[in-house]
Amino acid sequence: MFAAHLTNYAEDGHPTEQHAAYYEARARGGAGLIITEEHSVHPTDWPYEKLIHGFDESVIPGYRRITEAVHRHGTPIFAQINHNGGQASGMYSRLPVWAASPVADPMFREVAKEVDHAEIAEIVAGYALTAGHCVRGGFDGIELQCSHSSIVRGFLSPATNLRDDEYGGDLRRRARILLEIVAAVRDAIGPRRALGVRLCGDELIAGGTTIDEAVEVARLVESAGQVDYINTSIGVATSTLYMIEASMHIPPGYALFIPSAIRKAVELPVVGVGRFKDPLQAERALAEGHCDLIGVVRGQIADADFAAKARSGHGDDIRLCLSCNQECVGRMGLNRWLGCVENPRTGRESVALASPARARRRVMVVGAGPAGLQAAIAAAGRGHQVTVHERGDTPGGQVRLAAIVPSRAEFGDLIRNQLAECARLGITITCGSGVDAAAVRAAAPDAVIVATGAVAERPYWAPAEAAQVVDVRQVLDGSAAPAGRVLVVDEIGFHHATSVAELLADRGAQVEVVTPGMVVGQDLGITLDMENWCVRAAAKGIVQTTDCLVTGVAPGSVTLMHHPTGRSWQVAADWVVCAVPAAPAEQLYLDLKALGPGAGPEVHRAGDCVAPRRAHAAVIEGQRAGEAL
């Protein structure tokens, strides 16, 4: 099952051709059931720009494009409908947000308007209206989002429902709006279409819904006799989002206790979710009786053919999700359309695939990091004969180093997946072979793609004779072994500094991380890693110092400056580990370009040797370079 998740593909409140292509790719790839992203049921619900306005009749033609595309492959598709309630802002709607009680959401920090009885009736009618639009648009069923971000969740939760009328108080009264919505939607869609409810099993907040109450809600839903299945979730999107879309720091199947408990209490089919990245994990959850269906979202974002490969016994060919959250969850939080670090097709399904090359060419790729390997895959996919040359002993580039950190080991699946694809395409990879311009000319390929990565830059404040100043890469590759008092300098704001800080703390070092930013590893918030990093850092005694620049280093000490005030002081440090921007390793590319037209092969470059960035840029750029040949 391809469960509901945000995509940010909507335009002006309407579904797009990209929606149709995106969902069709998963239907073609064997998904047994698709549930779309949420569709808003009322004008007061517009928490983010690219939300589908299901309450507006003009969405129906777009719905039909989606359902027709999916039905071509025999796959049923449901629409999820929702009102986010107080977990929102009036920024886009220019209206007050509606909720059970006037409680300010911890993320949006906007006090909601407590809905009166007439407004509750308006919301219920909005669900029915939107469900009717979905039926007219060809959807096979409706899922009511009542879990991690929903006005219904707000009513169900004792933490956000402070009412003392018939919609507040005990659980049955708090569930009244849910049962009214169920009845109204069932009446709107008729008896032949499916109706599901997605419930939050544990909000993980003080005074919130717990698993025991969630089980009772499931019983109430079943007793209504109008619902066909129950889907599950964990956490609250604006308080404990890091538990809903868990990164690699949280084990697969972590939320299975929720469907397991609900399944014991009801006869309805129950859906389980929670970082299922491998078919074997899903099969085990089913075999052990935790649930009746498995929702796999990021796994099918990473590989649209996940289900078909699993069904045909080719599970080893699946491009496993990294659970890195960089291009899926991370892009959503930045109001960008959904993508994937390792699947350059995600978000571009509506763009035509590259056609086979007119003539087979001999292509040399220099560098076997994510950019070089993806370039090789793309070029070979067009029919070219491809060889990859890697200077080091092992493919992987900076990803291989990042995966050395135990808590980041799954990131190495990016390279494992690429190497498996290279093997299937017959790409030759030679390691331990440094290549210069003369070697390229001697090999005489028709085209060369330079993907030589980046090199560490030494900060201006670190003189060459300061032997105790090293780069994070030297720590990861083992060429430097800092110990004692270690100062880690974070000028990148991502996993570079935090991963090495943890690694050194685990080895017994006394670690302090200093950053010019307001928080250490500031972009960890985008990938939902910040909360877990802070917990682990505190447990390991890692000191975090913010708003500070390093201005000098001397034996045994480092000078810091608090940039808001200009105050300077010295801290003791035996070693300084730098996580600072790198420089492109572009010499080979420049040498080849300097040969001039006709004096050498066609030359392209990709990845960090263009400009040092993160893995997603390397993969996308590698794909483009390979497709250009």
Please identify what each model-predicted range represents.
Residues 1-366, 370, 375-381, 385-386, ...:
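Flavin-dependent oxidoreductase catalytic cores
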Residues 32, 140, 228, 292, ...:
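Conserved acidic residues
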Residues 169-170, 347-357, 412-413, 474-482, ...:
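Surface-exposed acidic, glycine/proline-enriched linker/cap segments
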Residues 242-248, 292, 399-407, 522, ...:
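Short beta-alpha connecting loops at secondary-structure transitions
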Residues 361-389, 395, 430-444, 451-525, ...:
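Rossmann-like dinucleotide/flavin-binding elements
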Residues 397-443, 524-551, 556-557:
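N-terminal Rossmann-like dinucleotide/flavin-binding domain of flavoprotein oxidoreductases
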Residues 558-562:
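SH3/SH3-like beta-barrel fold
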